[in-house]
Every structure is written in structure tokens, then in C-alpha cells.
Amino acid sequence: MTSVQVPDIMQRARRMARRLLAGSGSAAVTAYRIDPSAPAAFVAHAMRADGRILVAACPPEGTPLATAPDGVAVDVRLDVTLDAAEPGVRITAATAHLLGSLTWIEGEDRSLTLASSRASACHCAIVGEDPLERVREIASGPGGRLGIITCERVMLHCVSGVSSHDIEEILDIDSADAGAAPSISWSPQEIMGAHEAVSAVGQLGLRAVCEAVREGQLPGWVCSSRPAVGVCPTLWDRTMCVDVDAHGVTLMSITGEEVTTLVVSFAQVLAGAGEVGPALEQLASQALPQRLARP
């Protein structure tokens, strides 16, 4: 195997920020200026093609988001958390945070707003989920409200570190990725299937891939490495999937001494979640022979 070029880490961070704002993960809104101590309201969310974020919620009576009138902008904080689909252990893959203005839409204007909205990411008409459908369902339910959040920047915390991005940069990510297909939104079922495909490669294959990335023999990069202080011994000698998308897989390799998180990049952007298994199996088949040949 020959050395490979390290991919653009900032581009991957922007793709992750777009995924989170476009509908992935769980989102919560806080009207921090009205009552900072009030609990956040969990919302369904989706980013429109113009960069504004649609949110739908059923805020409890008496809370700031319930009493805020329609048509009046309210300063809010939006927090989105994406957890790994790893059973038995909670791993936070990424979080996004932004400050913006939320305006609740009057009842008669909701249908028009939803009908004229287009999601920022494509979705598969067969198995993919349109995040706007979830927003529409919550907004039309008992006590449901529909609003639009306008913002300029988003702060992202992910395995590659902390970064800040303009909304315009996130919207332009497809044009920045030369030759890449438009962003595809995978359904929760597809994401779960992709995680299972990563696990199916097996611990030996995943460890070989991790070693090859660390040694610069497979595309990717090491995000962090820290002592395994406080890690449950039952997790030692395991490699777990933190996240997976069309561009690569984020793995966490745990030993009794250290915890290493790294990104494995695919040679080409995948057309669908069903290609994750074959793509990672191919990388493992490249890395395994050299690992097994070592004394």
C-alpha cells in the first residue's frame, strides 16, 4: 500500500454541520432571553434551501415558547445532538449550536410555508426520509406550532474539533466538493443499516483499517488520542462506529491504554447507504494482509 493524501477536514466538518441542521439528530430550542432557566423544547427541524431552519414543536403551556405570539421574532438558541447508533453505550458523534431569531407562523400561513419549502438536502423517494414530513406532522398535531429560525453562523463540535461556519458555507458544500453528488439524506433505517454493515466487517478488520489510517496507508486521519482513564474494561480491545456517511466512517478504537478516534475516508462518494459494507470490506481487505504478516 502507498501513502495517501489526507482529505479536507474542514469540508467534512461543514458536511456534518449541514447534516445536523438539515434534520439529523435531536434538536432543542431555548428562548434564552425571555427565561434562561426555562427548559428547552424539543423540536422537529429541517433546513430550507435558503438556509433558514423550519422547526415544529408542541411547547408546554406557560413556557416561553408557548406564550410567544405569532409573527414576533424571539431570540433563541438551537442545539442539535447526534449520537452514534452503537448499542449498549452512548457516544456523541457531533453537536451543533446556533443563536438566531425564531418567528412562529400564524395558522393560516403554515400550509403555504410548508408547501413552498424545499429541504437543503435531497432525499430518496423510496427509502429516504424528507425531514419536512416530520416537521409537517408535528406542526399539524394538537398544540403544534411551526416556526422559522433565521441565523448567520453555526458552531460545530465533532471528532475533528470545534469550528464555526457561515450558513452560506454550509449551503455551498456541494459546489465545494468537486465532482460530488448532491447531498443525500439517509433515513434512520438506512443509517442503522450502515452502522450494522460497519460492525459486520469484524473487529479484526476494523483494527487493521485503523492501523492503516494511523500509518498513512489508507485515506483518513486521526482526530484524537487520549488515555483510557475511566473507560469501562468491558470496552477494551473494541473498535466502535461513531458515525458513517457517504464520504467515510468515524471509528473509535479502545485499548486498555488509550482511546483513539479516527476518520476512514472512502475512495469515492457512495451513492447509497447500502454501499457502506462493500466499501469498508474492500479497505479491510487491503489492510488485513499486512497486519497479519506482522510477527
Regions from the PLM with identified roles:
Residues 30-35, 81, 252-254:
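A generic structural motif
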Residues 51, 59-129, 137, 143-144, ...:
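Short, structured beta-strand-loop surface elements
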